[in-house]
Amino acid sequence: NILYRSGAKFDDDIYVTGELGSARAALMVKDNKKYSKEFKYLKKFLHTPKPRINIGIDLSKFATSCIDVSDGIAKDLKNIISESKCGANIYLDKIPFNKILNRIIERNNLYECIIGGGEDYELCFTANKSYSKRVKYLSKKHNIKITKIGNITEENLNYYENDKLIKLSLKGFDHFLN
């Protein structure tokens, strides 16, 4: 089965594998000697990402859409909802990220790093709510954190923080401009 970006359906859950933002954080601190130890750790996420091929194969049996997070989840999720002709609610406080980022990235740049940065190569996928136990099973089977970060709506892309609607203007990474 081939997973496309265009299959998301109203009320599907939105998930992401792994943690986001580490590759972008590595780029943000690479020249800052204060964070040389952290950069040494984070650069592996930038230079040697782990492709999620096996879990992608398993997801193809039930997920409704999927995309690799290469341009930042903000931009990649926009691709899913655009091609699926729907919207999404994203709960920013649910998005998993390496807690080291709290120490090295200024608070006002944290979301840009976590959802606007690219090169994570995790998977963002949608699935019918009835498959939530199967998602948990795949997380254990592949020893990969899978986190529900939102749900598909009829229209618009909305971001929430602590259950409050907030305005974000993140473009994500563009390989042709950056």
Model-derived segments and spans:
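A generic local secondary-structure boundary/capping motif
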Residues: 1-7, 47, 56, 78, ...
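Glycine-rich anion-binding loops of enzyme active sites
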Residues: 1-29, 147-151
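Internal active-site segments that recognize and position negatively charged phosphoryl groups
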Residues: 15-18, 49-73
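Short beta-strand-to-turn element immediately C-terminal to the catalytic PLP-Schiff-base lysine
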Residues: 17, 28-31, 126-127, 160-161
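Active-site-proximal beta-alpha loop/turn segments in soluble metabolic enzymes
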Residues: 23, 37-41, 62, 120
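A short, charged helix-loop
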Residues: 26-29, 33-50
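Short, structured loop/turn "capping" segments at alpha-beta junctions
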Residues: 35-41, 52-56, 65-67, 86-90
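Glycine-/charge-enriched secondary-structure boundary and capping motifs
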Residues: 61-62, 66-178
